[in-house]
Each structure stands twice: as C-alpha cells, then as structure tokens.
Amino acid sequence: MGNFLQSIIDRDPAAKSKLSLILTYPGVKAVFFHRIANFFSVAKFDLIARIISQFSRFLTGIEIHPGAKIGKNLFIDHGMGVVIGETSDIGDNVTIYHMATLGGIAPSINSNDQRNIKRHPTIGDEIVIEIGRASCRERV
C-alpha cells in the first residue's frame, strides 16, 4: 500500500500526504475495494464480489467490475464517472481521469454472444487516459 500511495504522490502535485490520499481520494478507495472484490471474483464468489464493487461505486462514483485485471499503482484522479469493464486489462502505473469509460468494444443485442470473450480494452503500462479534456491558461 505504501508504494501505491507514493506513486500517486509522485504523479499528483496536489497530493500532500499518504493520509490525505486514504481519507479524501475516491480513486484510492475504489482501487482498494477492487482488490478485495477481485479476490472474491477469482475465487468464484461472484455475488460477494459484486456486492463489494457496488458498495465501492456508491461510495466513490467509480465503477470497476470485479473481473477487471488491474496492474500496480493505478491512479484514478477526479474519479467521478469512471467505468472499468469486466474484461479490461490495465497495466502498471496507469492514470485515469474522470468520466473515462473502458467499456465494451463489441456491442451486441444478444449478450450470450459476448460471454467468455474479451470485449473491453487492454491498456499498457505508463498510460494516461483523459476524456474530453479542456485546458485553460491563466487568461481565457
């Protein structure tokens, strides 16, 4: 947990301390709950995994499917509205900003056609995902 928190401090100039990350960053909470939910998902306790992930969604506004594979040091900054789908595979040291959806890439009317196939993106290491970014300079 210490390396994870330090990796966020290294990437976010607004992060002041590890304690502030734990108490005030929803992305930290979402990743923590995902690790627990994923443990239960891998162990085939799917209902428990989904309950944990839905509690996390309620608490943080970030939805991570328990089956998603997430590498080390995922940083979800300003996480409201982030969705990470079931077959997503995320590498190490990835940063995701608000409103990003790693959703299904093959929509279908018949969900049976999509069971047990890869339908969400794979994200490599050291990637930053920003959706709809608008940067303003000092004067607009």
Functional labels for PLM-detected ranges:
Residues 42-139:
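Flexible, glycine/small-residue-enriched loop-and-beta-strand segment within the central core
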Residues 1-60:
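Terminal amphipathic alpha-helical/low-complexity segments used for targeting or macromolecular assembly
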